């Protein structure tokens, strides 16, 4: 499964794309756990002290908003977007 990372999340991980291995019945949350396991510095950027995903982090599956409990399928593209502002 491939994650696309944007803005400071890509900088922290050292790459805009990260492949993770997950079981066939994995959820988006399982894939996110695998991503954070491979890149522990991401944990404080996406999860609060309570272990919950920050409200300002957007998780997408195949270009659509995704819940962490949502099932994944082979070939899915997942993405993490931090808040983005511009001027």
From Swiss-Prot:
Modified positions (1-thioglycine) are 87
PTM annotation, UniProt: The C-terminal glycine is likely acyl-adenylated (-COAMP) by UbaA, and also probably thiocarboxylated (-COSH) to function in sulfur transfer.
What Gene3D superfamilies does the entry give? 3.10.20.30
Record note on disruption phenotype? Cells lacking this gene do not grow anaerobically with DMSO and do not show DMSO reductase activity, but their growth in the presence of oxygen and at 50 degrees Celsius is not affected. SAMP2 and SAMP3 cannot complement the samp1 mutation. tRNA thiolation is not affected.
Q: Which GO terms describe its cellular component?
A: molybdopterin adenylyltransferase complex
Recorded GO MF terms? nucleotide binding; protein tag activity
Protein name in the entry = Small archaeal modifier protein 1
């Amino acid at each position: 499964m491939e994650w696309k990372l944007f803005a400071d999340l890509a900088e922290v991980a050292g790459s805009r794309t990260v492949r993770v291995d997950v079981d066939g019945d994995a959820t988006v949350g399982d894939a996110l756990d695998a991503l954070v396991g491979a890149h522990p510095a991401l944990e404080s950027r996406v999860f609060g002290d309570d272990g919950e995903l920050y409200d300002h982090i957007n998780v997408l599956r195949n270009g659509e908003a995704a819940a962490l409990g949502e099932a994944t399928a082979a070939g899915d593209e997942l993405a993490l977007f931090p808040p983005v502002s511009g001027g």
